[in-house]
A protein has these predicted regions:
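Cysteine-centered catalytic environments shared across enzyme families
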Residues: 1-225, 229-280, 289
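Generic extreme N-terminal start-of-chain segments
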Residues: 6-8, 481-484
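Long amphipathic alpha-helical segments
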Residues: 68-70, 74, 84-88, 483-485, ...
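ATP-dependent adenylate-handling active sites, centered on carboxylate activation for C-N bond formation
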Residues: 97-100, 110, 175, 188-396, ...
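Short beta-strand elements
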Residues: 406-407
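Long, compositionally biased intrinsically disordered regions
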Residues: 502-509, 513-573
Length: 573
């Protein structure tokens, strides 16, 4: 899917909408909003005497009363929109006197924009937009944020002239100006942990089962089944609803994410696809998958995830839809360890009580950047301060505001954007109505202590998975996960000794491969082929970096080398 518009202020030409099946026309005109559906869908609904509401993407649900979306001031009521339409999509309101646009809950699918004195441009691709306006890839602040946090924190892109629309916001264009305004605050769905009884857990599980079934297509689809809780819970719901589906997983042949799902799918009588990431993949597909993944994500992704593209290309030969457990674990358990999803610097920003994180950021940046990023770091610290203070929240609630508004879209977004070129990834856990209900309970990660590390306290969210499986499929409810214990060990209080024993046994007997997806081998070969050993033209080297930092810095370096390459030639989406 793809969209583009160049809107000229005070133009005598009215705004038009043009639907395209797979590609833009050879001549792209001003004042026309081009909507390219690609593997997704494009639909519209008319609001009499007011305008037309367009949806581009893969929405789940239907608008019962579209006129209720439009507030008296012309803004879109995002609470109503997100309640009625789940899924990943971009929306466009073409009214009599304005165009407004934004994204679905979580802002996973981006809206990029560029503003000049006499016009504003919007697009789903920052690279395409940069090509149209001849924008140089010159945003050093973007580079700095990725060096520190693995992804940009706020609205920065590779290009100073192009910004990313914030999540849960609306960009409006009238005849004379444009504006960006946030329409839904975290406080609207952050909730308070007022529900804690078994009946509340049962009600939450029933709500999820009902909502989850809406995400599951009528035709055959795939479900990501791993050794953990997220995927098997989705399998349980699909079995309960007698859906036509197959399961799949990817990894090295010896990994638990291959062996456990394949073995358990067989017991359940399910067709299972094992996508093996061994020598054949490394030799024939990994490098190309890196290049394509990075290009299709506008180089906002990272080079350590080529297996997502490889698996999407294979699965697209079987189905147009997959249902995955993306976002699941993060909703229920308190995030706490540095890694690919969050760096030690991000943890420091949200956990430091004395604001000494600022000094530590300065020390870190000067250790590899000398004084080259002084101006950018000063501005970044000011913006972080403002972000921390403006919510009025503290602790884990303040951090989870960042998770919902920034982390989800920056970490999972490039993956889902890339997958859209092959198929549709439906993610039932990121559902506004469900999240709103979850955050009223003690099982939400929002209400856990900040960066809680106690393993057994962090298991509280697994009670939800256990309850869903208890009411969905008793076989899955009793099957062990790759963690060594089964959902019923968590869901039945009398089995706590069994849970403790199995957890300890797994911890001491675990012989799991350290590199399930052969990322080490992929990165080593890619570095040799690309001849990258540092950030170009900066003096910053990759020497002594841990794996996660190396992957992300290598991704930045690779993106820099590709900024002037001709990767805008294709307009097929």
């Amino acid at each position: 899917m793809f969209f583009f518009l160049k809107r000229i202020y005070q133009s005598s030409k009215s705004l038009q909408v043009k639907q395209c099946a797979t590609a833009l026309p050879e001549v792209v005109e001003e004042n026309i909003l081009y909507l390219v559906a690609g593997k997704q869908s494009c639909s519209s609904v008319e609001v009499p005497a007011k305008g037309v509401f367009w949806i581009l993407g893969d929405p789940i649900g239907a608008l019962s009363s579209p006129e209720n979306l439009i507030k008296a001031n012309g803004d879109i009521d995002l609470h109503t929109l997100y309640t009625e339409l789940a899924g990943h999509y971009n929306w466009f309101w073409v009214g009599r006197d304005r165009l407004a646009t934004g994204s679905s809950f979580g802002g996973i699918l981006p809206v990029y924009y560029h503003h000049e004195i006499n016009c504003v441009c919007i697009s789903s691709s920052s690279d395409f937009l940069a090509d149209r306006i001849n924008a140089p890839a010159n945003d050093r602040r973007y580079i700095l944020e990725r060096l520190l946090f693995h992804y940009p924190l706020f609205d920065a892109t590779w290009y100073q002239e192009i910004k990313l629309l914030p999540a849960h916001s609306q960009l409006s264009i009238t005849a004379t100006h444009f504006s960006v305004r946030k329409n839904l605050d975290f406080s609207a769905y952050s909730g308070t942990p007022s529900k804690s009884h078994n009946r509340d857990l049962n009600q939450l599980a029933e709500q999820f089962v009902s909502a989850c079934s809406d995400f599951m297509p009528v035709n055959r689809f795939g479900i990501s089944l791993t050794g953990g809780f997220d995927g098997r819970t989705l399998v349980g719901v699909a079995l309960k609803n007698n859906r036509s589906f197959f399961t799949y997983s990817f990894g090295a042949s010896s990994s638990s994410d291959i062996q456990v799902p394949a073995r358990q799918a067989k017991k359940l009588g399910l067709s299972h696809h094992s996508i093996i990431l061994d020598e054949n993949y490394l030799r024939n597909d990994a490098d190309r998958s890196i290049q394509d993944f990075m290009s299709l994500s506008d180089y906002h992704g990272n080079v350590g995830r080529p297996h997502y593209l490889y698996s999407a290309s294979i699965l697209s030969q079987e189905t147009s839809f997959i249902v995955t457990g993306n976002f699941g674990s993060e909703l229920f358990r308190a995030l706490h360890l540095p890694g690919m999803m969050m760096t030690k610097h991000l943890i420091d920003v949200f956990s430091s009580s004395d604001r000494q994180w600022k000094d530590r950021l300065w020390t870190e940046v000067k250790s590899w950047g000398q004084n080259d990023f002084d101006a950018e770091l000063e501005g970044l610290i000011d913006d972080i301060n403002k972000y921390l203070d403006e919510s009025g929240m503290t602790g884990n609630a303040r951090f989870y505001r960042f998770v919902y508004e920034e982390l989800f879209r920056k970490y999972f977004g490039p993956e889902i954007i890339m997958q859209n070129h092959f198929l549709n990834n439906r993610t039932p856990y990121l559902n506004y109505s469900f999240v709103h209900s979850l955050n009223q309970t003690i099982w939400s990660g929002v209400h856990r202590p900040l960066f809680e590390e106690n393993k057994f306290k962090r298991m509280i969210g697994q009670l939800f998975y256990a309850q869903v499986l208890r009411m969905s499929d008793h076989r899955l409810y009793r099957m062990k996960t790759s963690k060594g214990y089964a959902p019923n060990d968590v869901g039945e209080s009398w089995r706590k000794p069994v849970l403790f024993y199995r957890y300890i046994q797994q911890k001491f007997n675990q012989n799991e491969a350290l590199d399930d997806n052969n990322v080490f081998s992929v990165i080593e070969h890619f570095m040799q082929e690309s001849k990258l050993n540092g950030i170009p033209d900066s003096g910053i080297t990759f020497k002594g970096l841990n794996r996660d930092t190396l992957i992300n810095w290598l991704s930045i370096a690779y993106g820099i080398t590709k900024r002037n390459a001709n990767h805008y030639a294709s307009t097929t989406y």
